[in-house]
Amino acid sequence: MENMEMNFRLCKNHLDHTFVDLGKTPLANSYLSKESDFEIEKEIPLKALVCQKCFLVQVDEYEKPEDIFNNYAYFSSYSTSWLEHTKKFVTEMIEKFNISNNDQIIEIASNDGYLLKNFKERNIPVLGIEPASNVAKIAEKSGIPTITSFFGTETAENII
């Protein structure tokens, strides 16, 4: 279904310039079970438009977050390069911003908590915010306090 009158969500400018159109694609990380009928796999259009006013890009259609993150298949800990990066990144951030145990690190979309784990190992209080409950449970089991929620105004107000 084509949206003929689309405005950019940020600046409200009319969008009519296609940046890239990749056709239809299955939802990321929404693997089908062996019993699933591949012919009914949900596909969504992957078309991005660029705003001629602010030059930011947005997709013309998107799925509800609840449909994407109800059982997320990707875990940060699967990537050895990510794990190595987080150790270096945390060391650099602690030094650059003089972070101590008097501070708190909050990560939005914290996945299984491996970035926060590096801060916690240095006795810096942490909090993860992760919408996918299956991934958030893994973070909690490894000792990373995690709020299972989408980050928005309500979640921010609850944290404060």
Set out the residue ranges of the language-model regions.
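Conserved class I S-adenosyl-L-methionine
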Residues: 101-111
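Conserved SAM/SAH-binding beta-strand->alpha-helix loop
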Residues: 132-134
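Conserved alpha-helix/loop element of class I SAM-dependent methyltransferases that forms part
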Residues: 81-102
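Conserved SAM-binding loop
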Residues: 139-140
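Conserved SAM-binding loop of SAM-dependent methyltransferases across substrates and taxa
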Residues: 112-124
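N-terminal juxtadomain amphipathic helix
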Residues: 2-81
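Conserved SAM-binding strand-loop segment of SAM-dependent methyltransferases
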Residues: 143-156
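Conserved SAM-binding motif I beta-strand of class I
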Residues: 125-130
